[in-house]
Amino acid sequence: ILHVAPEQAFFKFLKSVNNKNYITFDLNSPLADIKGDICAMPFEDNFFDFILCNHVLEHIVDDTKAMKELYRVLKRKGIAILQVPINVGRDKTFEDNNITTKKERIEKFGQYDHVREYGLDYYTKLESIGFSVEKNNYASKFIENDINKFGIVRDEIIPICKKN
């Protein structure tokens, strides 16, 4: 398992159940076993069975290169969860490299450290890299009370990416 930019809650759980085969990777995180750039990862081709990469790619200037790296290190028949915030009202991803100030980025991308706002074309982009993508509406599996209790985003689609 490769966990890019490990979140504390997932980190604790995955470390406790899969300590020997769980590798964390990030540019700066103190939780990272290996520090490095997602656009040039120090792993062999076809190394990981599973990759978890939540809310990372919207921060990466060359997201295509990062996606290609994730594809490269994923084993054939491996699975990658490559979640990003998606504006479902936008068909095409919006990015503009001239938007550089924190204020402008908050206005245009929703957060000061985002470099784009993904649209519905995100899934097609993943497919263009080579992944097959299953769009999983996981929230539909929960009852209304649990959606509110756990803070689940009702219409969020989780891309389950596979390398064939």
Give the role of each language-model region:
Residues 100-116:
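Conserved catalytic/acceptor-binding region of the Class I
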Residues 112-136:
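Short alpha-helix
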